[in-house]
C-alpha cells in the first residue's frame, strides 16, 4: 500500500463556489487561532509554516485545491489542544514522566477548540488534531494507529511538523 494514502479514503467533500467564501472565512479564523497557539507554545510562525508545507504537499499529491485548502486550515490549528494546557508546562525546559504524559493529552484536548469548524469539514480537523502524533509503525499516540489506519491529513502534518521543527530555531 502507498505511504501517502492511495489506499486511505480521501475526504468525501465536494468544494463548490459557494463553499469558497466559507473556506476563506475558515482560513482567517484558523490563522487567528494558529497565532494564539504559536504564542502559547512559544513557536514563532509554527502554525503558518506547517500549514503552508501541508498545502504544498497536498498540491504535489494532486489533491483538489479545495481539499488542499482544508488541509491548510486544519494544519493551522492541529495543536489547538495546547490552548487547554498550562503555559508553564508547555514551556518547561525539562519534563517529568508525568508531565510528558500530560503534554500528550493536547491531542484529545483539541476537540473543544474546534467548535467553529463547519460540520462537513469536522473529520479532517479532528483527524489533524487527534492523530498527528501517530506513527506509521504504530509507536505513536494516542491510539497507536499504524499504516493505513492513519488518515492522510495526520500523515501530512506529521511530516511537515517534523521538517519545520528540525529546520527552525525554538524561541
Tell where the protein language model's regions lie, with residue ranges.
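Histidine- and acidic-residue-rich, metal-dependent catalytic cores
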Residues: 3-4, 9-171
Amino acid at each position: 500500500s502507498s505511504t501517502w494514502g492511495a489506499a486511505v479514503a480521501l475526504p468525501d467533500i465536494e468544494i463548490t463556489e459557494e463553499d469558497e467564501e466559507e473556506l476563506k472565512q475558515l482560513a482567517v479564523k484558523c490563522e487567528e487561532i494558529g497565532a494564539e497557539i504559536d504564542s502559547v507554545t512559544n513557536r514563532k510562525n509554527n502554525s503558518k509554516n506547517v500549514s503552508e508545507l501541508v498545502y504544498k504537499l497536498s498540491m504535489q499529491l494532486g489533491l483538489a485545491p479545495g481539499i488542499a485548502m482544508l488541509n491548510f486550515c486544519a494544519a493551522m490549528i492541529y495543536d489547538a489542544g495546547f490552548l487547554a494546557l498550562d503555559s508553564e508546562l508547555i514551556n518547561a525546559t525539562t519534563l517529568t514522566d508525568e508531565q510528558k504524559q500530560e503534554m500528550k493529552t493536547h491531542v484529545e484536548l483539541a476537540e473543544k477548540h474546534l467548535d467553529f469548524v463547519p460540520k462537513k469539514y469536522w473529520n479532517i480537523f479532528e483527524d489533524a488534531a487527534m492523530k498527528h502524533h501517530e506513527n506509521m509503525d504504530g509507536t505513536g499516540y494516542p491510539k497507536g494507529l499504524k499504516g493505513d489506519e492513519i488518515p492522510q491529513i495526520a500523515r501530512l502534518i506529521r511530516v511537515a511538523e517534523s521538517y519545520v521543527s528540525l529546520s527552525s530555531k525554538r524561541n
